């Protein structure tokens, strides 16, 4: 996919931010279903230049350009054209950075949006790694930035700020943010699904909710519990493997266990206190439905 494109049903997203802010990690965890715990324990090496990846998402193609933070002066000046035709710019900021640095970076990106006349480009700011600070600080920082950008936001409704993290206590929250961003930018009613797909997802989410983390489950026992045959269960487990929610056991191919992704997803879903149980179940189904339809087509490093 070219650097600049504006063809119908093609979406261009640019990830930008200071060095080591977590841009690539977010892409890996939510777009490529990487293990968040592994990436927390073994952080990725810094991106050099830029990496581009293309994903299919229902009837859309999403191109993501991940820009190396060490080369921001280059992107903001000589190579500013890499932002051309962007449908969305996601600015990932390490919440530990100085507030003055955060503001400066945000305004630099806003200047690019203005200079390239990206009127319809959505600008989403991620205050990332919020698990490493107390909640009162993250809330006060969010309010401060919203107040600082108040005039800009009134003029441009496409500007939004989110608090994100790939850590356990915020994993589902961030998953939900990415889900909402995808559904908004594609401007489609992606929630609608066939009755058969809804039933499949109900079983698959029920498997996640019923199973306990780090416990071994035999396929036949699970099939008996849900009153489905072995082939039907195999299909459900294959889909859950696509989401990296389960892993088959190497020496016991007819058994599986939940991954930490599934466990963190389940913990977050259950903690959605503002919704009644039925709505929580529906939200889980909608998110799984969306991400089962997100697939990497190819990537260029």
Specify the residue positions occupied by each region the protein language model found.
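Conserved Switch II/interswitch segment of TRAFAC-class P-loop GTPases
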Residues: 86-107, 131-137
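Short amphipathic alpha-helical interface segments
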Residues: 193-225, 284-298
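Short amphipathic alpha-helical interaction segments
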Residues: 227-243
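Short, amphipathic alpha-helical interaction segments positioned at domain boundaries
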Residues: 260-298
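Conserved G1/Walker A P-loop phosphate-binding module
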Residues: 1-42, 60
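Canonical P-loop GTPase G-domain recognition
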Residues: 133-194
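Switch II (G3) loop of P-loop NTPases
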Residues: 59-76
